[in-house]
Amino acid sequence: MSTATATALTPELAAKVERLDALLAQIGERHDKVKFASSLAAEDMLLTHAILSKGVPIGIFSLNTGRLHAETLGMIDRVRERYGYEIEQFHPQQDAVDRYVAEHGLNAFYESVELRKSCCHIRKVEPLNRALADVGAWVTGQRREQSVTRAELHEEEQDEARGIAKYNPLADWTEADVWAYLKAFDVPVNPLHARGYPSIGCEPCTRAIRPGEDSRAGRWWWESRDTKECGLHITTITPIPANAEAGAAH
């Protein structure tokens, strides 16, 4: 960390950054192959910078659902330009997409939670399973503060369904922490954030949030807040005890 950058951070955030760098390095060393699932939104651009600027051996991929905003897809180019890194993209199986559209309609996800989750499974979960088929661990940019569905998030977990470790290194970071980091390190960010989109998913399923709403209120806004997950993180998860998490950063 440069002196100029260090002075731009509060002591508390500087300590979080130091711990984050140490944790990512240890994750990369601990497992033969690790991948980071990036949505190309703010938290994930933070982790992209932390990984690539330090040369941590963690691969980065994104799920190109076929229905992302142009601004989100543009972040792949910005990462290439800034870091010289090509983010790996995983796409849904076209035959599964075609069957869903033929049976239910292109935008059937508005009709019920079941049809929405089915669409998410085809466009996100199945590609994620392929992306993680050959890894020992994966990393996410999830934070506890984001929504009620993530309030119990642990920094280190065991993804029992896939038989691999799962890390959420930003679990205890606040939104203010994230944006202070992005500003201090001049990290490129999705322009949709400036238009009121703190959480960004597929274009037809994401809207800008209103004052006072939580950061994920714009995702699947027509549903109850308790159902707002796409299935990427809804698997059998075993939290790692807090003392083990603390040890992982040393």
Curated annotation (Swiss-Prot):
One of its GO terms (biological process) is sulfate assimilation, phosphoadenylyl sulfate reduction by phosphoadenylyl-sulfate reductase (thioredoxin). Its main location: cytoplasm. GO terms for molecular function: 4 iron, 4 sulfur cluster binding; adenylyl-sulfate reductase (thioredoxin) activity; metal ion binding; phosphoadenylyl-sulfate reductase (thioredoxin) activity. SUPFAM superfamilies: Adenine nucleotide alpha hydrolases-like. GO terms for cellular component: cytoplasm. Its EC number is 1.8.4.10. The active site is at C230. Gene3D superfamilies: HUPs. It comes from the Bacteria. [4Fe-4S] cluster binds at C119, C120, C202, C205. Its cofactor is [4Fe-4S] cluster. It catalyses: [thioredoxin]-disulfide + sulfite + AMP + 2 H(+) = adenosine 5'-phosphosulfate + [thioredoxin]-dithiol. Pathway: Sulfur metabolism; hydrogen sulfide biosynthesis; sulfite from sulfate. Pfam families: PAPS_reduct (PF01507). Keywords: Cytoplasm, Iron, Iron-sulfur, Metal-binding, Oxidoreductase. Binds 1 [4Fe-4S] cluster per subunit. It is found in: Cytoplasm. PANTHER family: 5'-ADENYLYLSULFATE REDUCTASE 1, CHLOROPLASTIC (PTHR46482:SF9), 5'-ADENYLYLSULFATE REDUCTASE 3, CHLOROPLASTIC (PTHR46482). Catalyzes the formation of sulfite from adenosine 5'-phosphosulfate (APS) using thioredoxin as an electron donor. Belongs to the PAPS reductase family. CysH subfamily. This is Adenosine 5'-phosphosulfate reductase. The gene is cysH.
